[in-house]
Structures are given as C-alpha cells and as structure tokens.
Swiss-Prot record:
Name of protein: Protein translocase subunit SecA
Biological source species: Shewanella oneidensis (strain ATCC 700550 / JCM 31522 / CIP 106686 / LMG 19005 / NCIMB 14063 / MR-1)
Self-association and partners: Monomer and homodimer. Part of the essential Sec protein translocation apparatus which comprises SecA, SecYEG and auxiliary proteins SecDF-YajC and YidC.
Binding residues for ATP: 87, 105-109, 512
Keyword line: ATP-binding, Cell inner membrane, Cell membrane, Cytoplasm, Membrane, Metal-binding, Nucleotide-binding, Protein transport, Translocase, Translocation, Transport, Zinc
Subcellular location: Cell inner membrane; Cytoplasm
Protein's membrane topology: Peripheral membrane protein
Family the entry assigns: Belongs to the SecA family.
Biased composition range(s): Basic and acidic residues: 879-888
C-alpha cells in the first residue's frame, strides 16, 4: 500500500523514464519544420555528415535527435508515413539497451527503422532479428526503400544462402534475418577452415522483434550442429582384417634387443605401439589392399586419418576383451564399467574405438551422431555489444529480461487511447458446454457483422472447432502454426465484416488485422492499378471499416487459457489496435488443462453446489484471479528451468569462448611457431616429470621408460642412461634442458629439410585439426557429464558445484591433450613438400563435406541433464488426472514417490 502511495506521488519508474525521453522527442519535433525544407539531396547527405561527426569523436546520443528527425522526414517522403511521438519514444528505448513494450498495431516495424539507422551509422552492422523467414523478407523489403534513400544497404540472412551471399548480407549496413540463422552462422564461423570462410562480422547491435518469443519461449532450446561422419563401416571392416596378421612383441626394441614382433603393449597406459618392422608390415598390407599408394607412408601428412583407424583397430584387438571391458548383447557392443562391473548402455568410446570393437565382433557398425557445435540463444545474444528488443507483451516477463539479459523493460504508451473491452472469463463445467457457448457467441457476432478471431492453444482444438462450424454451416478460415504467405493474407483480411478466423495462438503474429480488411493488399493484387481503381478500393474499404466499427470492432474469442499470461495478452492484443473498437473474452471449462491441474475439485464442487445447470457459466473476478495465480505458478516454474539451464550452459559457454577465441587467433595468425615452441617445452617437461619426478633422488628415476616414451611419442632416440653414466654432474634440471634442446634441434632439422613456410602452414593445419577433434570429443564428454550429474545429489553433493568442478577438470584435460597430441604429430609426421600440406587440407575438407550436418534445436532437458532441482521441477510438471480421486496422503500419481499433498496436491 505504501509503495502504491509513493508511485502516485512520484510516478512509476516507467513514467520517469518516459519523461526523460520526452525531452528528446520535443527536440526532434522542433527540427521537423527545418528538415521539411531540405531537398532530397540535402536530406540524403545527412548520412555522410553523421558518419563524419562520429569519426571525429561524437557519440550516438549527441546525434540521436537529428538522426531520428532525418529518418522521420525520409519516411514521410518515401512511405508517406510519419513516425508518431510514441514511435520516437520506442526508438529511443531500443537504442538504450532496453526492451520496448509496444501494443499490437503501434507500428513496431516502422519504429525499428529509427535505432537501426542510428546504429548503422557506426559502420559496424545492425542485425534486425525476426521469428521466421517470411517476416525477415517482408520487413527487409518493406524498409529497403527508406534505408536506400538514406544511403544505407540492406541484407537478408535466411537459410539456404551460399557463402558469398551470406557475406554480402552481413556486410550490409542493416541485416534482417531469423534468430536460428544468426545463431547457426556464429557456430559455422567457428568451424571454418580459413578466415575467408567466416561470414559474420563482430557482433555489434541486435534488435529483436517479438523479443519475448525468442529470448524467453525459445531460450530453453539450444542450437546444435551435429553430424554423423560418412558411413566408414567398410573402412573399419577392411582394417579389422589386417590385425590378425600382426604379431605381438614382449618388449620395446633397443640397442641390446631387436625383436621380431610388430607391436608392443603398454598395459599400464592402455596403449599399443608399432615397431619399425610392424609399421612396414602394415604399410605393405594396406598397399596390397589398395588402401595406400605404392611408396606412400602411413605417417605421411595426408594419412593421419588412416593411422587413427589402424591404431583404433589394434587397440580393439589387443587391449579390449569381450565380457571384461564390454559385452555383446542384441547385436550391440555395450561398455562394462571397469569399477562397478555394470553395463553402460548408450555410452560409446571415442576416437573410433567403439566402431573398431564393433568391426572386431562382427556386429553392425554404428555411426555416431556427434555434436560439432552448440549454443543457447541466451548465450548467443549476450555476445552482442548492444542488445534491444520489442514486443507487444513484455511487462509480465520484465524480471526475467532484467535478471538474465540485463535488459530493462519500458512500456511505451499507445498513440491513441485503448478502447478495447476485455470481458471477464466465462467458466463452464464441461468442454462440450464451452464449445456450444463459443458457437453461439460466433453466430451472434456474425449477425451483427462483427469479425471474430478465435484463438486456440493447439491445432487439434482448432480442427475440432472447425468441424463444429462446418456442422453449423458457419463460413470460416483456419490457420495452423505453420507460417507462410497465404497465412499473412488470411490474417490481414480477418477484420472484414462477419469474418470468422480460427488460429492457434501464435499463428499470424507480425501481421496487423485491419478493420474492414487490408485495402493495401487488394491494391497490390492488381497489375498497374489506376488512380480510379485505388480510390474505389479505398472507398469500399471505408464503408466496410465503418460497418465493422459500428458492430463493435474485432472480437477476440479465447477457447482456453494458456499457461502463460503473456500468450493470452498477445491474443487479446490482436484487437483494439490504434484506438480501434474491439472486445475480448475467454471461454473456459473445468476440463481445460490449466483448470484441471490448478483449479482442483473444490472449484467444480462449488459450481455444482451453486446448482448450476448445463450450459450455465460462472463469471466472477475471484475465478479470474485464481486462474491468474495458477498462471503465475507455471511462469515461475518455467523461469526456474530457464535459469537453471543458463547456470549449466554458462560453464560450457566460458569454455566455448576460450576455444573459439583460440581458434580464431590460430586462423588469423601468419605463424604459430612461438606457440609451438612454448607448448613443446610444456609437453616434453610433463613427460619427463612422469619418469623423473622433480627434486627426486636418482634411484627413483625410470630412465629406460623415459627413453622408450620419448622414442615412441616424439621420435627422439636419446642415450639418456649413457649420458648419466658418463657425466656425474648431469643433474635433473640440466638433463631436462638437454632433452628439450634435442627435440628443438630435431625439429629445426625437419624445418630445414621441408622449408619454414611449409612447416608453418603444416603447424597451423595440425593445431586446428587436433583442436577441432578434441573439442568435439569434449562436447560429447560434457553431454555425458551433464546427463548423470544429478546423481551426485544422492552423495550429498551439490550437482551444480560438481558439474563446474568436473567440467573444469575435463577442460584442463582437453588443453593438456591438445598440447601433447600436436607435438606428438609434428614429431612423427613426415612432410616432404607444400603439396603434402595441401593434400592434408584437401582430405580434411573432403571429410568435412561428407559430414551429414544436422541443424537442430535440442530438447532443453538434454542440455540440462538432471539437477538437485529436478524434484522441484517434477513437482510442478502438469499432470492429467484420469483415474479415481487421489487422497491427500496417497502416493502422488506423477511417480515422484512423495505424498500427493507434498507434490501435485500443493497446487490444488
């Protein structure tokens, strides 16, 4: 009460914000007379003038009033449309990292031209984001004449464009497109092979239309690029046949011992290594089978992939034993947990090992559908330097916009007072009674000539109503959720006299319903219309418009309450645009999902006690309040889920940004020789530490093991034991330096042989290829971690903290493995000439082209996995009760294991 009193005296925060912005509106209005006197050329020259001032150090705020006045004047000349003062207010809100709530019909598309023009003057690009391709194309084409008049370029970014078309779209001053396409382009850019393949510029300013739909409704669905590599089962099968020809050797070759085997096994490290004899034998076998060219080496740059396959097959045969490490069940290889002995269905080994085991066992080889890249909309849009959005319904979600995106919501007043009548809900006992009442209301409206828009929550419900209308011989149009051009036409004509249109709640969003029908569309349908034809169409429309207004304007009829108040408000907002007449009413029944879950038996019991007969409805503010409270509960639950998703994804997002930044630096750098030098010191030192622990006595050193490891992994054949025997003063630190220097000398010799430029290019190619491969494996490991993390709760641990800790360990592992693998490959692989590097790049591109990429929205639940909040979420999950009444102390039918009163009964 005290808060309401303060608001009355000082005004709300929204009022104070608008009051501050009104001063700038007054400035823009004061400039209007002067700008009207400018010629077209003088008005167009304003763009160059503003750009010069910005280059000289002026701020966008300092030129805002003049820039907005320029756009308003240009719009009057190009479109014969003048921005209202409220649209100027909306434009200023959108320029200041806020969300503008503007009612339906207030001209959001025209409002967006103001901040889009202002921010495009910086030359950094503006992205105007819509919910579908149709709206992106429509808005871009509608506004193109205005922007081009002012000397700006417009691009359209939709699915299916070629790389150059994408680049052109992004290089435009203002780019229209869908949220999905912008997100996927970001992911694709971070999978590019060269800087020339990237299409996006740095993310500067995003202006999101229908911001609630994109940042809230779709926030839980991450964008994922996944792909199954080409079907390489034939390759696994062929390589599998080579392994039985190979002979095991008990110990590594040395000066004292030269074995006759083909490979050795390091059981401790679970690794196998070819002997020189074995390498030659495998190469000969591959040449015999036509898998390797005559004279080619398995260790040449172009054959890295083949080498991986051979190693995987050898490991499958020698290190992994059936009924110990895995079992074969129903034609599938299932991993056995080495610690618990339990099977782990659904889990697969990486690096091609699982497929190699499948080939060994003769079962069907499955291609993994691997996540190549992923991001949530929440984290994608937070990458922009500036972010703003507009919608007709944001105020109910203002807290979420502020909490997650740091965006304040400002409710922009309507240009004309709202006169729509929002009538109280009518609640019936059964769905059948409700539908009969809806049909009666539609018939009454048709008799008066009043158009009706019937909003349903599902396609199934819209089809049911359509069948009832056919039965009653009521002419109507049905729209489902699939948006296409025809739908826009139907929605545009839904305001004609006596028209009846059934639409799912979201269908047709973005198209205004004009009372009397859309006369512009009628004119557009004619080829070269004469002024007389235009005048007749407009006169006919005026008669229809007046008749519809006299009948009460557009009547919105809701057939069920949505679980979100915002969606209900969107439906209501289709009527009463620009001060038009209109009305709205929701028809509900006790069988509706929301009522059945939340309103409980008490309400229907009360309705029966009131002696309500069939067909009678209850209409009371108390019922409307109860429904609103139910909706608040659902909204709160959904907010918790989105917040939880973000907390989990933030961990992955930090890692994603580190990897992508590193990748971009790699691609843009001319040489990464210094990086290679630094990591080789780290890698060799780490290997030495395993065999010669720092500051340890010589008795603890495993010198033969170190010699063997350096030879196997880095092709360094060093007589370390001999050095130690001959030089008494050779201590740990000087030995370390000598080994590192030996690697550097060997690498320099390789550089002199192949040439510095070839090796620099090869280093980049190896580093990128290794990083990409490990990142894909890391994403899979993160998925597995996320799916099982909620089980940590049973051990009295906080799943979120455990997820952060374990994912950090996985990331550290990724970085260490990256360093090790890059140095190992650079040590082993033989590069003869530039053509080897080019061949390696060509193979890599070929393999990438074979990936059947799948651009998809993942289920949010898969991204979250489980958590300590799972039970709380489960307790709020809508449940349909279709059996006997559940007692308060009975187990809840949802399966949570709790008593009904402590679970879904809480909501009754």
């Amino acid at each position: 009460m005290f808060g309401k009193l303060l608001t009355k005296v000082f005004g709300s925060r929204n009022d104070r914000t608008l009051k501050g912005l009104q001063k700038v509106v007054n400035k823009i209005n004061a400039l209007e007379a002067d700008y009207e006197k400018l010629t077209d050329e003088q008005l167009k020259a304003k763009t160059a003038e503003f750009r010069e001032r910005l280059a000289a150090g002026a701020s966008l705020d300092s030129i805002m009033a003049e820039a907005f006045a320029t756009v308003r004047e240009a719009s009057k000349r190009v479109f014969e449309m003048r921005h209202f003062d409220v649209q100027l207010l909306g434009g200023m809100v959108l320029d200041s990292n806020r969300i503008a709530e503007m009612r339906t019909g207030e001209g959001k598309t025209l409002t967006a031209t103001l901040p889009a023009y202002l921010n495009a003057l910086t030359g950094k690009g503006v992205h105007v984001i819509t919910v579908n391709d149709y709206l992106a194309r429509r808005d871009a084409e509608n506004n193109r004449p205005l922007f081009e008049f002012l000397g700006l370029t417009v691009g359209i970014n939709v699915a299916g464009l070629g790389q150059q078309d994408k680049k052109d779209a992004y290089n435009a001053d203002i780019t229209y497109g869908t949220n999905n396409e912008f997100g996927f382009d970001y992911l694709r850019d971070n999978m590019a092979f060269s800087p020339q393949e990237r299409v996006q510029r740095p993310l500067h300013y995003a202006l999101i239309d229908e911001v609630d739909s994109i940042l809230i409704d779709e926030a839980r669905t991450p964008l994922i690029i996944s792909g199954a590599a080409e079907d390489s089962s034939e390759l696994y099968i062929k390589i599998n046949t080579l392994i039985p020809n190979l002979i095991r050797q008990d110990k590594e070759d040395s000066e004292e011992y030269v074995g006759e085997g083909d490979y050795t096994i390091d059981e401790k490290a679970k690794q196998v290594h070819f002997t020189e004899r074995g390498q030659e034998k495998v190469e000969n076998l591959l040449i015999e089978r036509g898998m390797l060219a005559e004279g080619d080496s398995l260790y040449s740059a172009a054959n890295i992939s083949l080498l991986h396959h051979v190693n995987a097959a050898l490991r499958a045969h020698t290190l992994f034993e059936r009924d110990v490490d895995y079992i074969v069940q129903d034609g599938e290889v299932i991993i056995v947990d080495e610690h618990t002995g339990r099977t782990m269905p659904g889990r697969r080994w990486s690096e091609g090992l699982h497929q190699a085991v499948e080939a060994k066992e003769g079962v069907r080889i499955q291609n993994e559908n691997q996540t190549l890249a992923s991001i949530t909309f929440q984290n994608y849009f937070r990458l922009y330097e500036k972010l703003a959005g507009m919608t007709g319904t944001a105020d109910t979600e203002a807290f979420e916009f502020q909490h997650i995106y740091g965006l304040d919501t400002v409710v922009v007043p309507t240009n004309r007072p709202m006169v729509r009548k929002d009538m109280a809900d009518l609640v019936y006992l059964t769905a059948n009674e409700k539908y009969q009442a809806i049909i009666k209301d539609i018939k009454d409206c048709r008799e008066r000539g009043q158009p009706v828009l019937v909003g349903t929550v599902s396609i199934e419900q819209s089809e049911l109503l359509a069948r009832l209308m056919v039965k009653e011989k009521i002419p109507h149009q049905v729209l489902n959720a699939k948006f296409h051009e025809k739908e826009a036409e139907i929605v545009a004509q839904a305001g004609r006299t006596g028209a009846v249109t059934i639409a799912t709640n979201m269908a047709g969003r973005g198209t205004d319903i004009v009372l009397g029908g859309n006369w512009n569309m009628e004119i557009d349908a004619l080829e070269n219309p004469t002024p007389e034809q235009k005048a007749k169409i407009k006169a006919d429309w005026q008669l229809r418009h007046d008749a519809v207004v006299a009948a009460g304007g557009l009547h919105i009829l809701g057939t069920e309450r949505h679980e979100s108040r915002r969606i209900d408000n969107q439906l209501r907002g289709r009527a009463g645009r620009q001060g038009d007449a209109g009305s709205s009413r929701f028809y509900l029944s006790m069988e509706d999902s929301l009522m059945r879950i939340f309103a409980s038996d008490r309400v229907s019991g009360m309705m029966k006690k009131l002696g309500m007969e069939e067909g009678e409805a209850i209409e009371h503010p108390w019922v409307s309040r109860a429904i609103e409270n139910a909706q608040r509960k659902v909204e709160a639950r959904n907010f918790d889920i989105r917040k939880q998703l973000l907390e989990f994804d933030d961990v992955a997002n930090d890692q994603r940004q580190v990897v992508y930044a590193q990748r971009n630096e790699l691609m843009d750098a001319e040489s990464i020789a210094d990086t290679i030098q630094n990591i080789q010191d780290d890698v060799i030192s780490a290997v030495i530490d395993q065999y010669i622990p720092p500051q340890s006595v010589e008795e603890l050193w495993d010198v033969p093991g170190l010699e063997q490891r350096l030879h196997q992994e880095f092709m360094l054949k060093l007589p370390i034991q001999e050095w130690l025997d001959k030089e008494d003063d050779l201590h740990e630190e000087s030995l370390r330096e000598r080994i590192i220097t030996s690697w550097s000398d060997a690498y320099k010799a390789k550089e002199e042989m192949v040439g510095a430029s070839v090796l620099r290019q090869f280093e980049k190619a190896v580093m990128l290829q290794t990083l990409d491969g490990l990142w894909k494996e890391h994403l899979a490991a993160m998925d597995h971690l996320r799916q099982g993390i909620h089980l940590r709760g049973y051990a009295q641990k906080n799943p979120k903290q455990e997820y952060k800790r374990e994912s950090f360990e996985l990331f550290q592992q990724l970085l260490n493995t990256l360093k090790h693998d890059v140095i190992s490959v650079l040590s082993k692989v033989q590069v003869q000439a530039q053509s080897d590097v080019e061949e390696m790049e060509a193979r890599r591109r070929e393999e990438d082209a074979k990936i059947q990429r799948d651009y998809q929205h993942a289920a949010a639940e898969a991204l979250v996995g489980g958590s300590d909040e799972d039970d709380a979420i489960a307790a709020h999950t809508p449940m349909i009760r279709d059996g006997d009444k559940v007692g308060r102390n009975d187990p809840c039918p949802c399966g949570s294991g709790r008593k009904y009163k402590q679970c879904h009964g809480k909501l009754s």
